[in-house]
């Protein structure tokens, strides 16, 4: 298949692996963070780490939207379904995220909550149209990739004059998060590993372009290479990062030029800016409260804001004591460093959110890498 098969070619991968080995200076080590969960999945699925020299290490980042969703936000969604009696719609990955009191949206559904999996925000709008006597709430999560469809849904609901549709907005921002990771006193206090550069996300960058990464590449002297999700994309990005480090450069380079340019999708950006504005603070699982790292619905569309329509409130809830999900999201620990990984915590019985989503570091390692821990 065009744009897939050629980026999974084994012979080319061998050549790239050799090129990376030649490029890497054996006298030093390299630590690169793949921010996006899609890259984490690709690295695990295709065994990219096994093709790298021993001194080139990949660190999992917090770029999995389900993984960074704090328990308190899931609790809000559950309360909407069980206490307010709304029809709650959300993406499939959200259904099994552990919440307070051993609950999840799936378990809340078993208790009688009207909770439905949808494939897009448009499905929730259609449901509200067909059920005018029911309050329908769309639990909106994700980075910049899924934000424009939510904006479209809100504008569509406004155009249709729907009074029974609202959105619980938990959309978060990639560049703000990376900057906050690099400068946050809480993160420094927790002690993250040293980072030599980032593999920038693919789908997010199709929306925002490469321009937003330039600030922290210049400000923090960390090179960034935006890469696609195929194994050869990732390997080429690693080679480009190693070369930047060796040459003392800290620039934003674009390996994924077949889909990403510097400016991104301007129409989508304008749409998001029309419907949403920055939140002053937002809690991320594992990263505490990060300033200006998430979006909320503008006052012009306040009638579609579930946080204003329903008496929700927000309470921060700590993670399970045995769960290392927070440390894994910060890049401090690996999935195999968690005592309950693969025993108490499995994809069938997730204790932490990193085991829930297919983009989560723990789920990826459980599926593709745990056999190496025993070998």
Write out the residue ranges for each language-model feature:
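Metallocofactor- and cofactor-centric catalytic cores in central/energy metabolism, strongly enriched
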Residues: 1-133, 147, 157-160, 166-168, ...
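A conserved active-site cap/scaffold subdomain adjacent to cofactor or substrate pockets
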Residues: 188-261
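Short, conserved secondary-structure transition motifs
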Residues: 170-179, 264-268
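Glycine-rich, mobile lid/loop segments that gate access to catalytic sites or pores
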Residues: 145, 151
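A generic structural motif
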Residues: 58-65, 165-173, 225-232, 255-258
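Internal helical hairpin/lid segments
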Residues: 235-327
């Amino acid at each position: 298949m065009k744009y897939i098969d050629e980026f999974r070619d084994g012979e080319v991968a061998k050549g790239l692996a050799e090129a990376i080995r030649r490029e890497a200076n054996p006298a030093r080590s390299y630590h690169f963070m793949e921010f996006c969960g899609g890259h984490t999945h690709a690295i695990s699925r295709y065994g990219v780490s096994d093709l790298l020299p021993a001194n080139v290490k990949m660190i999992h980042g917090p770029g999995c939207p389900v993984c960074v969703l704090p328990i308190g936000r899931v609790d809000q969604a559950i309360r909407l379904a069980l206490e307010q009696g709304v029809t709650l719609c959300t993406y499939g990955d959200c259904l099994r995220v552990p919440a307070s009191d051993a609950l999840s949206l799936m378990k809340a559904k078993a208790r009688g909550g009207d909770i439905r999996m949808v494939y897009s925000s448009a499905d929730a709008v259609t449901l509200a149209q067909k059920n005018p006597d029911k309050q329908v709430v769309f639990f909106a999560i994700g980075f910049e990739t899924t934000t424009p469809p939510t904006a479209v849904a809100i504008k569509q609901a406004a155009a249709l004059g729907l009074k029974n549709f609202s959105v619980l907005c938990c959309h978060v921002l990639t560049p703000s998060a990376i900057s906050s990771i690099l400068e946050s006193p809480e993160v420094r206090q927790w002690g993250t590993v040293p980072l030599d550069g980032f593999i920038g996300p693919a789908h997010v960058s199709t929306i925002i372009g490469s321009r937003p990464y330039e600030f922290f590449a210049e400000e923090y002297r960390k090179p960034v290479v935006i890469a696609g999700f195929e194994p050869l994309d990732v390997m080429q990005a690693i080679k480009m990062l190693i070369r930047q480090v060796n040459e003392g450069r800290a620039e934003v380079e674009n390996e994924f030029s077949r889909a990403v340019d510097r400016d991104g999708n301007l129409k989508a950006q304008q749409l998001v800016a029309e419907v949403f504005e920055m939140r002053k603070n937002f809690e991320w699982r594992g990263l505490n409260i990060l300033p200006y790292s998430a979006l909320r619905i503008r006052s012009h569309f306040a009638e579609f804001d579930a946080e204003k329509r329903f008496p929700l409130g927000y309470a921060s809830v700590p993670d399970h004591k045995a769960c290392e999900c927070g440390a894994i999201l910060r890049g401090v620990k690996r999935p195999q460093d968690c005592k309950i990984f693969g025993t108490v915590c499995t994809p069938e019985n997730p204790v932490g959110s990193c085991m829930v989503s297919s983009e989560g570091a723990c789920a990826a390692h459980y599926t593709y890498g745990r056999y190496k821990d025993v070998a």
